[in-house]
């Protein structure tokens, strides 16, 4: 994960001090890209321990079209707690947009099912895209989508994906985002009988919060370790039938975790 550490170093050295919605303050750069060859290992940060349970359960929650934190709470995942209302609702965030985007004529569009069908029937299409940025519903969302738009690409029997992330919390959020989309590529590839290719991450406002600076320096002092390997133990009938126990991460030997406050 040298790419990730190089980005963190770049933000520290070149970032512009900026105010932000949370009032915390950031060092920020605009426009950065990283490429991860998924054949080389699963891109899970090793210079601190990442909470893999949260990453997997959150993705399964998205895939189910869920926007209430009850499922997450049942599985001891607290990453969305700060944004939920008193009933646990978050409004029409990722899961709703991915699985039931509201069309003007009243239809509900299942973008992910459409992607699976496109990959199987027309893998050379340049329109294999999912968007969470629904302008008409942004004001109803507890948090506007940070990872907003992603596209799939097939070449030589390998499935690649590029994500555009309009806002990126480099220390806390980005390791989750990279691992989550890498996991999605593996799942999608399995469902479509493809090998995995690259995950390409593209960031807009890419920042370190002012209260994450010391933690970033600590992480940069650590040497990255060998990437782990993802094992999917069975092939379910559809993309939406995976369970938490279907996944093993072999050989994950990270440095200790580093605590940091969340900017809300």
From Swiss-Prot:
Pathway terms, separated by semicolons:
Pyrimidine metabolism; dTTP biosynthesis
Protein's cellular compartments: Cytoplasm
Which of UniProt's keywords are assigned here? Cytoplasm, Methyltransferase, Nucleotide biosynthesis, Transferase
Concerning Pfam families, the annotation shows: Thymidylat_synt
| Active site as annotated | 146
Catalysed transformations (reactions): dUMP + (6R)-5,10-methylene-5,6,7,8-tetrahydrofolate = 7,8-dihydrofolate + dTMP
The GO annotation for biological process reads:
dTMP biosynthetic process; dTTP biosynthetic process; methylation
Gene3D superfamilies in the record, alphabetically? Thymidylate synthase/dCMP hydroxymethylase domain
Q: Which InterPro entries match?
A: Thymidate_synth/dCMP_Mease, Thymidate_synth/dCMP_Mease_dom, Thymidate_synth/dCMP_Mease_sf, Thymidylate_synthase, Thymidylate_synthase_AS
Q: Which GO terms describe its cellular component?
A: cytosol
Q: What is its EC number?
A: 2.1.1.45
Q: By its UniProt entry, which PANTHER family does this protein fall under?
A: THYMIDYLATE SYNTHASE, THYMIDYLATE SYNTHASE 1
User: Quaternary structure per UniProt?
Assistant: Homodimer.
UniProt function note? Catalyzes the reductive methylation of 2'-deoxyuridine-5'-monophosphate (dUMP) to 2'-deoxythymidine-5'-monophosphate (dTMP) while utilizing 5,10-methylenetetrahydrofolate (mTHF) as the methyl donor and reductant in the reaction, yielding dihydrofolate (DHF) as a by-product. This enzymatic reaction provides an intracellular de novo source of dTMP, an essential precursor for DNA biosynthesis.
Membership in a protein family: Belongs to the thymidylate synthase family. Bacterial-type ThyA subfamily.
- The entry's protein name is Thymidylate synthase
- The organism named in the record is Yersinia pestis
